[in-house]
């Protein structure tokens, strides 16, 4: 529904997974890690010689022994990974701006993977592109999200709450000072 509201037209510019993969020369796999694993059997048959498989995160390829995502040898496997949340990326795109992105080439079967990757990075509005690998992107993304965004912030908030409680603040006061301020 969101795609249609944004002007995509079913059967003209909007397709189901199989039809999109069949028609496309660059198959963009922009799904959650769990979703990539579940749709991989659907996508793989359409990855014919010369196509490119594009990711925005290195997880599925880095741990392909666990995800089962093993691309055919005769396709390019590329990545442009915006350094921000999907919500931020979408908001900035609608404003005509972009986020910095890392890029990587896992497999260059056509000899054109670099050109495709840089063009896609520019096309999505990346303000700055810097080279990485799928493995480094996956590791830095997971440690950044799980360590800094989830773990560190939560730990700081908990520590502040506990210090306030230890110093005589009521639970309500400690909570509000921690969360509301």
Where are these regions (language model features)?
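Short secondary-structure capping/turn micro-motifs that flank functional sites
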Residues: 19-21, 86, 137, 180-181
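Rossmann-like NAD(P)-binding element
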Residues: 4-62, 70-85
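Rossmann-fold dinucleotide-binding core
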Residues: 54-146
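Helical "substrate-binding/catalytic lid" subdomain
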Residues: 123-181
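Electropositive phosphate-/nucleotide-binding environments in soluble metabolic enzymes
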Residues: 11-14, 30-33, 37, 107-115, ...
